[in-house]
């Protein structure tokens, strides 16, 4: 059977929050089967647990924020993307501040942490959400959609009127039966425009942003001396974000996602629209690995196929 997964060991890291600029202590811990991904604010007294679920999403300005009462955890999407890419169903994520550390702006450091902790299969069937009917949400010229697909596929189109963004690097569609999340997506960094930085910081956002954890673009060019990690790193980061946002369904997805200029807000609207339309999805498990369109070859390397 395809089993649920958690971490073998706890592991710790330190970083800064992208928007708060605060130092953050992060601890990833194993969790029992059927727990899901639980974010825990250990700096609060008493600590507050916030399940990583679409219905707990509050603020979606520039990042995805989970909330429970007055407690918040911002910028969860890059860590969740790594959890999804490696097939981690259950974990406790402890943070000492209201934000997951940005690390290098990608999911790569989280992939490294999870692999370093080790991945353990649990004695429980892995639960998937399978898309049965198309679901679409729109805002002006932006849209996001789910379609039935026997596997996991993500397509995204971004558009900015800027010389750095071209048709060649503005669209990507990845079928994870033939694409490695770790190799082709996980290292794509978040990006931002210098012209927006002053406005963001005036609103106490992006206080921890730097060339060490983001691709920065002025009116003409990329400012990072080392350039891009992928030719299409911008759109691949949007795919990375979407994978993290989609994992707030609580389970791995069997289906196709397409986004056109969508962001965290529209992604969450799509999840809520899907969950509200009960005949558009179903929860499934697989007793035999050969029956599943998503295969996990061995702990540590999750491959859709």
UniProtKB/Swiss-Prot annotation:
What's one GO BP annotation on this UniProt entry? lipid A biosynthetic process
According to its UniProt record, the EC number is 3.5.1.108
Q: In which pathway does it act?
A: Glycolipid biosynthesis; lipid IV(A) biosynthesis; lipid IV(A) from (3R)-3-hydroxytetradecanoyl-[acyl-carrier-protein] and UDP-N-acetyl-alpha-D-glucosamine: step 2/6
A single Gene Ontology CC annotation of this entry is:
membrane
Residues recorded as binding Zn(2+), renumbered to this chain, are 78, 237, 241
Keywords carried by this UniProt record = Hydrolase, Lipid A biosynthesis, Lipid biosynthesis, Lipid metabolism, Metal-binding, Zinc
Which cofactors does this gene product need? Zn(2+)
Matching Gene3D superfamilies? lpxc deacetylase, domain 1, lpxc deacetylase, domain 2
The UniProt entry's coiled-coil ranges are none
Q: What class of enzyme is it?
A: hydrolase
Q: Which residues form the active site?
A: 264 (proton donor)
Q: Which family does it belong to?
A: Belongs to the LpxC family.
* Function recorded in the entry: Catalyzes the hydrolysis of UDP-3-O-myristoyl-N-acetylglucosamine to form UDP-3-O-myristoylglucosamine and acetate, the committed step in lipid A biosynthesis.
Name of the protein in question: UDP-3-O-acyl-N-acetylglucosamine deacetylase
Task: Please name the taxonomic classification of the source.
Answer: Bacteria, Pseudomonadati, Pseudomonadota, Gammaproteobacteria, Chromatiales
The gene it comes from is: lpxC
């Amino acid at each position: 059977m395809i089993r649920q997964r958690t971490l073998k060991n706890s592991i710790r890291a330190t970083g800064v929050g992208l928007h708060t600029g605060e130092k953050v202590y992060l601890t990833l811990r194993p969790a029992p089967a059927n727990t899901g991904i639980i974010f825990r604010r250990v700096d609060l007294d008493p600590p507050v647990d916030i399940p990583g679920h679409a219905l707990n999403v509050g603020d979606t300005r520039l990042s995805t924020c989970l909330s429970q009462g007055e407690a918040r955890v911002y910028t969860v999407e890059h860590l969740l993307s790594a959890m999804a890419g490696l097939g981690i169903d259950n974990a406790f994520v402890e943070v000492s501040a209201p934000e997951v550390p940005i690390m290098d702006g990608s999911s790569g450091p989280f992939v490294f942490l999870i692999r370093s902790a080790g991945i353990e299969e649990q004695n429980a069937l892995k639960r998937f959400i399978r898309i049965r009917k198309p679901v679409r949400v729109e805002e002006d010229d932006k849209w996001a959609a789910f379609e039935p697909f026997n596997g996991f596929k993500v397509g995204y189109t971004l558009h900015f009127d800027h010389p750095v963004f071209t048709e060649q690097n503005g669209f990507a569609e990845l079928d994870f039966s033939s694409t490695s999340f770790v190799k082709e997506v996980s290292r794509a960094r978040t990006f931002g425009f210098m012209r927006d930085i002053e406005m963001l910081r005036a609103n106490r956002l992006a206080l921890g942003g730097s060339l060490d954890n983001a691709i920065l673009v002025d009116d003409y060019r990329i400012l990072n001396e080392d350039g891009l990690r992928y030719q299409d790193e911008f759109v691949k980061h949007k795919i990375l974000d979407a994978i993290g946002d989609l994992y707030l369904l609580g389970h791995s997805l069997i289906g196709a996602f397409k986004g056109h200029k969508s962001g965290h807000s529209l992604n969450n609207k799509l999840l809520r629209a899907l969950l509200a339309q009960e005949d558009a999805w179903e929860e499934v498990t697989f007793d035999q690995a050969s029956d599943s369109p998503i295969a996990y070859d061995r702990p540590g390397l999750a491959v859709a196929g």
